């Protein structure tokens, strides 16, 4: 009798354990199937994203990446937020991701650099960035810099009274505040005591030129380069024999501008000789403004240059050297005019320079230098800068939309 009772209890316990185990197995299988559906839906989202980037144009229809899988994929523009939404559904699992348009948050300043600038000869600001309007006038900004700035020669900021308007819609009759107008006869440096620059020259330790201009962090610059708006130029190519050949930067730029490709991303060191500067000037003035962005290399112009547009020099990892300037035939000129700076020079303007728009220099090392020999004249134009930054706008995934909380 006792044996029967014990056997019955053991059987009941076994059946209970079996049911529990079966339940756990079934639940695990369901969870796996659910996760498989979720992963398939995520794959569908990635399929849609691959068809949206790098052109950043919504396709008329989404091509099926794998017709053996039952995944429904959609890609559309949210009319309220202007976010691009990629979504996919597999069985009962739905996944969606949002991409928001990166916007420029550029600070005031006609010329901006995360490094340092040296100018020999005269500096004329025909039209500064108006900056912030207050009751008494405008807090105008000519230069914004992170490193140091020096001018050997005369310097004058004419303000807003005599030069062209900073944009087409600018109707204000107010002038730059007197404390935002610099006039210097002789040498002036950001380290001078007493202070020789007025408040139109702003030293900014938090300046991040690339991110401020494009709305994209420096380390994600490939998003901007591949956004479909820039025409990319690679100045060094490898032959079938394995040899490296260097293209003429000025010739490549002219070729693209003549094809109406106005926003150029130039990879490698670029020297634009005097032979091309007149044609570049004419083509830029016939447009709403061009963008010349030189990335990871030294940048130089030989001769008098005049450009309507945005000049952008962006070095993230590149380190300039005397040997590199020598290889490009510019070493002797830099050594003659800036003998103490040739090892850290990243940009060199060998002749007078005038720009209508803006100039931006973003270097990883604040000690790297942009050097200007001969006269430098700037006319800030907000419309030209906006044309450049908005043309290069890129979509980035929206924070919180990709498990990046």
Language model features: what each stretch is:
Residues 1-39, 43, 49-405:
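Compositional signature of intrinsically disordered, low-complexity segments enriched in polar residues
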């Amino acid at each position: 009798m006792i044996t029967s009772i014990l056997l019955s209890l053991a059987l009941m316990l076994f059946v209970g354990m079996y049911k529990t185990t079966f339940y756990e197995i079934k639940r695990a299988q369901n969870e796996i199937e659910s996760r498989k559906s979720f992963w398939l839906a995520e794959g569908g989202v990635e399929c849609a994203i691959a068809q949206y980037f790098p052109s950043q144009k919504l396709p008329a229809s989404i091509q099926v990446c794998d017709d053996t899988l039952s995944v429904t994929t959609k890609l559309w523009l949210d009319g309220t937020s202007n976010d691009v939404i990629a979504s996919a559904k597999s069985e009962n699992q739905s996944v969606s991701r949002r991409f928001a348009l990166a916007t420029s948050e550029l600070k005031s300043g006609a010329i901006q650099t995360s490094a340092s600038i040296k100018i020999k000869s005269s500096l004329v600001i025909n039209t500064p960035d108006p900056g912030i309007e207050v009751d008494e006038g405008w807090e105008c900004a000519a230069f914004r810099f992170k490193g140091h700035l020096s001018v050997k020669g005369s310097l004058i900021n004419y303000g807003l009274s005599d030069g062209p308007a900073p944009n087409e819609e600018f109707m204000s009759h107010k002038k730059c505040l007197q404390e935002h107008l610099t006039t210097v006869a002789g040498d002036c440096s950001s380290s001078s005591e007493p202070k020789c620059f007025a408040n139109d020259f702003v030293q900014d330790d938090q300046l991040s030129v690339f991110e401020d201009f494009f709305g994209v962090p420096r380390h994600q610059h490939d998003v901007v380069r591949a956004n479909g708006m820039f025409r990319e130029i690679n100045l060094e190519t490898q032959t079938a024999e394995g040899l490296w050949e260097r293209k003429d930067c000025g010739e490549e730029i002219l070729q693209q501008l003549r094809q109406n490709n106005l926003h150029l991303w130039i990879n490698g060191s670029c020297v634009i000789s005097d032979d091309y500067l007149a044609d570049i000037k004419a083509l830029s003035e016939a447009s709403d403004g061009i963008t010349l962005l030189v990335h990871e290399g030294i940048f130089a112009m030989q001769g008098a240059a005049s450009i309507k547009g945005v000049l952008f020099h962006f070095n993230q990892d590149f380190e300039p050297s005397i040997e590199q300037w020598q290889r490009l035939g510019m070493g002797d000129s830099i050594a003659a005019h800036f003998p103490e700076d040739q090892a850290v020079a990243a940009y060199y303007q060998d002749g007078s320079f005038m720009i209508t728009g803006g100039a931006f220099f973003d270097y990883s090392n604040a000690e790297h230098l942009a050097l200007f020999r001969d006269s430098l004249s700037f006319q800030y134009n907000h419309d030209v800068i906006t044309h450049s930054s908005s043309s290069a706008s890129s979509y980035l995934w929206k924070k919180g939309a990709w498990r990046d909380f």
